[in-house]
Regions:
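Short beta-strand/loop motif that positions the catalytic acidic residue
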Residues: 201, 207-209
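Active-site loop/oxyanion-hole signature of alpha/beta-hydrolase fold enzymes
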Residues: 37-44, 50-91, 95, 252
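Conserved alpha/beta-hydrolase "acid-adjacent" motif
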Residues: 214-219
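Conserved HGGG/HGGXW glycine-rich cap/lid loop of the alpha/beta-hydrolase fold
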Residues: 8-61
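Acidic beta-to-alpha connecting loop that harbors the catalytic carboxylate
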Residues: 17, 211-213, 237-239
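Catalytic active-site module of serine/aspartate enzymes centered on a nucleophile-bearing elbow/loop
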Residues: 230-260
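Conserved alpha/beta-hydrolase catalytic His-Asp/Glu region
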Residues: 122-130, 140-199
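Flexible "cap/lid" loop of the alpha/beta hydrolase fold
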Residues: 101-106, 111-145
């Protein structure tokens, strides 16, 4: 399904019964809406699900230039308006987590519960430099040189070495991500900070991450402690793309939190 919103055309998928609570899934950098296939299958009987390729990803348009999270948040609200979605729950991972943190701060009235996964919630000078290096590689040589370094960062070593099915799925998504989209969203990731204002968020929040997601795992524990009433689930034997490393555990925790 193609939806025009905020000046570009988004690729979207809608499933689940009409009249059920809306649940929006938001993808990570260099993936597309199909990263959520296991969760869509598990929850589509209980929720009206919107999955969309974020700006510059999958089959959504990929304008040139550097994007910001303000822009990515505006995209979501424009999509919701175009589809007459008054209010929805949110589940986002990595870049989708940061987008959700921005929405929780800018548009809390448009959302019910937030499930925020595998992100530190802010950039640092070091991570900013790393993103700029990756941007330079993509502009010079395309996405191919970024595939293996990315999957090695994202997946636990034993999962990567075994070449588990989810690794190949993600390899293909990274390789086929439009360069404009990668560059635009990587620029947003290089310069953002949603940590400072998260303690003021009133919506119910579940933080969820893999136990092997490096600094993001530690950051999620800190953010849970800083936001009164929020919950934390750490998935065992899971890395950055925790919903694919532990799909059944992830879907169960997601469903239980959204149904509380």
């Amino acid at each position: 399904m193609k939806i025009k919103a905020n000046g570009i055309t988004f690729n979207c998928d809608i499933s689940g019964p009409e009249g059920a609570p809306w649940l929006i899934f938001s993808n990570s950098l260099a993936t597309d809406l199909h990263m959520w296939d296991p969760q869509e299958t598990a929850l589509k009987d209980r929720f009206r699900i919107l999955r969309h390729d974020q700006r510059g990803h999958g089959a959504t348009e990929a304008p040139a230039g550097r994007y910001t999270f303000d822009l990515l948040c505006d995209d979501v609200i424009a999509l919701m308006d175009a589809l007459n979605i008054g209010k929805a729950h949110w589940c986002g991972l990595s870049m989708g987590c940061a987008t959700g943190m921005g929405l929780a701060q800018k548009h809390p009235d448009r959302f019910g519960r937030f499930v925020l996964c595998d992100s530190s919630g802010r950039s640092s000078p070091e991570s900013g430099r790393q993103w700029e290096d990756r941007i330079a590689i993509a502009l010079k040589d395309g996405m191919a040189p970024l595939v293996e370094p990315t999957v090695q960062r994202w997946f636990p070593p034993e999962v990567y070495k075994a070449n588990a099915p989810q690794v190949d799925i993600i390899r293909t998504m990274i390789r086929t991500t439009p360069v404009n989209g990668f560059v635009g969203c990587a620029a947003a990731l290089a310069d953002h900070d949603f940590r400072k204002l998260m303690p003021s968020v009133k919506n119910p929040v579940l933080w969820m991450c893999g136990d092997q997601d490096g600094p993001n795992t530690a950051a999620m524990k800190v953010m849970q402690g800083e936001l009164p009433g929020s919950q934390l689930v750490v998935l065992p034997n899971a890395g950055h793309i925790s919903n694919l490393d532990q799909p059944a555990m992830f879907s169960k925790a997601l469903a239980e939190f959204l149904s509380a």
